Amino acid sequence: MEELSQALASSFSVSQELNSTAAPHPRLCQYKSKYSSLEQSERRRQLLELQKSKRLDYVNHARRLAEDDWTGMESGEEENKKDEEEMDIDPSKKLPKRYANQLMLSEWLIDVPSDLGQEWIVVVCPVGKRALIVASRGSTSAYTKSGYCVNRFSSLLPGGNRRNSTTAKDYTILDCIYSEVNQTYYVLDVMCWRGHPFYDCQTDFRFYWMHSKLPEEEGLGEKTKINPFKFVGLKNFPCTPESLCEVLSMDFPFEVDGLLFYHKQTHYSPGSTPLVGWLRPYMVSDILGVAVPAGPLTTKPEYAGHQLQQIIEHKRSQEDTKEKLTHKASENGHYELEHLSTPKLRNPPHSSESLMDN
């Protein structure tokens, strides 16, 4: 335990927020065992099949988030409270549950999809912190992935200020990345717009809707008294080799953190999913086998070899049996992406045994 504590202390930046995006990504050995039992490609196939029959009540789910109305949920919370009392959990360490784990998170793109160029789209992401944005009843709230409300302000989102919140049904829920440097919420995805939920809609439609509706809200992309933070939609691009090369040669109005790859048919499902993949820009050449132009985005940092080696070893290990995979996961470590933003380490790891900055 002491060795583990020392390793964590040396690699994770200090933060009071659980799973803070100010901390580096978990190392490979923290990859959950349930993600080791099946290949990433197989889990993608199963999830696409599952979402065809899985129809959750997202209308009420979105309404609860917007109105902070959890009537009827108390019984389940009471059962959880009893379980926590039996486990003797410190009340001060319990997390807010209602707004926690509401964002769809990615996994490292390990198994390259055979239909990448046809069925996937890519979004270039800025350095920042993931945020759940809820605009309702004349106010806009920003929550962390862990469910903490970190800010309340007015915005020009539907339902986000007292002027445009004409009815209780005018609420909006967005998945964003907040850039403190640019004082901007970059919109990744839309879960609800003017009271209409989009959880069960495919990614390509959600993105189309988002980029159609955001420009209609005049002044949303400007910083004003009634809209103190800009809201800007992140563009998406095809995943063909030609498109990826063009994207990686572009200039962006923000510091680029990485690339999110979305399957076009993916519904918005809170939690980690293999239907959304994550790569740093310099990984595209090695992982996807795409020739990329030389430039700032594709320049490999000193620690790049360690990250790539772990991912490539994972791909090779999938030729082994399930038992060997599970053993290798605990030995060499395989991981899923719990954070989006990745701050730079002052002293990048130079040992394969050190924690990775991913």
From Swiss-Prot:
**Residues bearing the modification Phosphoserine:** 75, 351
**Region Necessary for binding to the m3G-cap structure: start and end of each range?**
210-329
N-acetylmethionine: modified positions: 1
One of the GO BP terms on file: RNA import into nucleus
Query: What transmembrane ranges does the database entry give?
Result: none
Compositionally biased intervals (Polar residues): 7-22, 349-358
Region of interest: Interaction with m3G-cap structure: 128-130
- Chain positions of site Interaction with m3G-cap structure: 106, 145, 278
**Main location, first listed in the record:** nucleus
Which UniProt key words apply to this protein? Answer: Acetylation, Cytoplasm, Nucleus, Phosphoprotein, RNA-binding, Transport
PROSITE patterns hit by this protein: IBB (PS51214)
Molecular function per GO: nuclear import signal receptor activity; RNA binding
One Gene Ontology cellular component term attached to this UniProt record is:
plasma membrane
Report residue spans for region: Necessary for interaction with XPO1: 1-160
Q: Where, subcellularly, is it found?
A: Nucleus; Cytoplasm
Q: Which residues form the IBB domain?
A: 11-73
Composition bias (Basic and acidic residues) maps to 315-341
Region ranges (Disordered): 1-26, 69-90, 315-358
Tell me the disulfide pairings in this chain.
none
Q: Which Pfam families match?
A: Snurportin1, SPN1_m3Gcap_bd
Segments carrying the region annotation (Necessary for interaction with KPNB1 and m3G-cap U1 and U5 snRNP import receptor activity) are 1-65
Q: What does this protein do?
A: Functions as an U snRNP-specific nuclear import adapter. Involved in the trimethylguanosine (m3G)-cap-dependent nuclear import of U snRNPs. Binds specifically to the terminal m3G-cap U snRNAs.
Query: How is this protein organized at the quaternary level?
Result: Component of an import snRNP complex composed of KPNB1, SNUPN, SMN1 and ZNF259. Component of a nuclear export receptor complex composed of KPNB1, Ran, SNUPN and XPO1. Found in a trimeric export complex with SNUPN, Ran and XPO1. Interacts (via IBB domain) with KPNB1; the interaction is direct. Interacts with DDX20, IPO7, SMN1, SNRPB and XPO1. Interacts directly with XPO1. Its interaction with XPO1 and binding to m3G-cap U snRNPs appears to be mutually exclusive. Can form homomers.
Q: Into which family does the record put it?
A: Belongs to the snurportin family.
Mind telling me what this protein is named? Snurportin-1
